[in-house]
A protein has these predicted regions:
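Single conserved hydrophobic/aromatic residue that forms the stacking wall/gate
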Residues: 267-275
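N-terminal ligand-binding lobe of clamshell/alpha-beta domains
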Residues: 1-268
């Protein structure tokens, strides 16, 4: 984080003019009933859909218009990860208050919700949301524990080069009853640490392949035609599934709800000939 959270907790009612450089804080503020504080969002915001109509879009994911953001006179700007470090630095040089989260696990996602709740004086509502997500996760775990067979799952975040699941996605796979074949790679902080070769996937021979290419549609046919992939169980059994990036690659409420449901739906039931 670039600023201490306590700065805003101590102020009356918290910040009143918030710019969200990524979708997650926007969705969180809406769920907290604090959307009236939002004055700017990213062009990639799709949750909730009404946000695009209500707030000006002032940033992409990596960069944004410092001038437009400053013209909104924000008292807090919220962003995500080292990918937005350059934009954050520009905004700080422009005397803006910037808060950068870097949540990579489900627990960290929940902590972000609680932190934003504290910042906008909506702690009780934030705790209620988090309790609900924890309950849903426990239900998913209990359901998964009843499954005799835990399918091996390969999640592909990008195709060339291929990147396997980031940490929270790997955790969702495990919660839903699957076994992430590259779970160790998910602990890497950098995307490069999750790079895999197509031959590595062949060696792992997953039962299910989940694909969510950040920024473009998944080409299932091209995946099928990769060298050696015709021997993979998931390919032979037509178990390649695309998941919308907006519900799985956003480290916020979307992943804990629609993302978890999508992962559960695509691999909880396997054809008997895949075992």
């Amino acid at each position: 984080m670039c600023i201490p959270v306590g700065v805003y907790v101590a102020s009356q009612g918290g910040p009143q003019r918030i710019v969200c450089l990524t979708e997650e804080p926007t969705e969180i503020l809406y769920l907290l009933g604090e959307e009236h504080r939002i004055v700017g969002i990213t062009v990639y915001t799709v949750r909730p859909p009404e946000a695009r109509e209500r707030h000006p879009m002032v940033s992409a994911f990596i960069d944004g218009s410092v001038r437009k953001i400053c013209e909104l006179e924000p008292d807090l700007i919220i962003g995500f990860s080292d990918i937005q470090a350059d934009l954050a630095a520009k905004l700080i040089k422009a005397n803006q208050q910037v808060l950068i989260f870097n949540q990579r696990t489900i627990e960290e996602i929940l902590e972000v919700i609680l932190t934003i709740g504290r910042i906008v004086a909506a702690e009780e509502r934030a705790q209620h949301l988090v309790d609900g997500y924890r309950s849903a996760i426990e239900v998913a775990k209990e359901r998964a524990n009843k499954i005799e067979y835990r399918p091996k799952v390969y999640f592909e975040e990008w195709d060339e080069p291929a990147f396997s699941a980031i940490r929270w996605v790997s955790e969702l796979i495990e919660i839903a009853g699957g076994e992430d074949v590259f779970s160790e790679k998910s602990h890497g902080k950098l995307a490069a640490e999750r790079e895999v070769q197509w031959s590595d996937v062949v060696d792992m021979n997953p039962d299910v392949i989940l694909a969510s290419w950040c920024g473009k549609p998944v080409n299932v046919e091209s995946m099928r035609n990769r060298p050696g992939w015709d021997s993979i169980t998931a390919v032979r059994n037509n178990r390649i599934h695309e998941i919308d990036p907006s519900i799985i690659l956003q480290p916020g409420p979307a992943s804990l709800t629609d993302g978890l449901r999508a992962v559960s739906y695509t691999h909880l039931t396997l054809p008997t000939n895949s075992r």
